[in-house]
Each structure stands twice: as C-alpha cells, then as structure tokens.
C-alpha cells in the first residue's frame, strides 16, 4: 500500500449507456485523482478500462458526485487490489473549484481576464 495519501473524488455517470447490442449498461463510477494532470485533464480509474485520463469538462457535463454506497466497491478495489492509500474529497466542492480554474485560465488566455 502507498505511504502517501492520494486525493480522489468519485463520480458516477448521470445516464446509463447502451452496449453494442442495445442492452442498457450500469452507470460507471469513476475515481478522479484530483491532484494529477493539469487544470483540464486528470488521471482517473474505473472498473471498465481501469487507469486512464478524463477531462474535467466530461466530469462536469456527464457525471455527478457518487454516493458512498455507489463508490464503495471502486474505492475498495483501488485500496485492496491496486494498493492506493486514499483520501476521499468532496466531489461537488472539487468540481466547482476545478471548473472555476478552467474558466480563469481560459479567460486569461483569451485576454478576457482583468
């Protein structure tokens, strides 16, 4: 297990997806490693696909913060199988902060910042 804590927020898709034959798939829970990557892209982990990268915009538009019951199986997988020492942060708070950063950087780059 990691010695250092890894900050993570858990999100779940707002809508179910359809499989290749039209079957309704369960909504995927994604762990977002909030201190990784840059202001737009974050490392993430899901049962399906495991480690990857996700856009902050995707999290904001397609997901909502997961409840403990929803994210507990993924959290246990990350801790017990992968070996993370997790510190769970509030997803709604993190997303509000992250989207604020995206807007500030975009405004600065476009010359709209004061």
Where do the model's predicted regions map?
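Intrinsic-disorder/low-complexity regions
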Residues: 1, 42, 105-106
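Mixed-charge, Lys/Arg-enriched low-complexity segments
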Residues: 59-114
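Acidic, low-complexity, intrinsically disordered interaction modules
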Residues: 20-72
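Basic/polar N-terminal segments that are highly enriched at the extreme N-terminus
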Residues: 1-3, 114
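Intrinsically disordered, low-complexity segments enriched in small/polar residues
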Residues: 17-20, 35, 47-50, 81, ...
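Tryptophan-anchored aromatic micro-motifs
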Residues: 4-18
């Amino acid at each position: 297990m990691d010695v250092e804590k890894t900050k993570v927020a858990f999100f779940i898709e707002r809508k179910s997806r359809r499989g290749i034959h039209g079957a309704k798939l369960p909504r995927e829970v994604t762990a977002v490693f909030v201190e990784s990557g840059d202001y737009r892209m974050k490392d993430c982990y899901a049962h399906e696909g495991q480690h990857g990268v996700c856009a902050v915009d995707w999290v904001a538009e397609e997901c909502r913060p997961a409840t403990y019951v929803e994210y507990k199986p993924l959290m246990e997988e990350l801790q017990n199988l992968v070996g993370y020492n997790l510190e769970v942060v509030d997803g709604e708070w993190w997303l509000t902060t992250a989207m604020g950063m995206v807007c500030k950087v975009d405004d600065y780059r476009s010359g709209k910042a004061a």
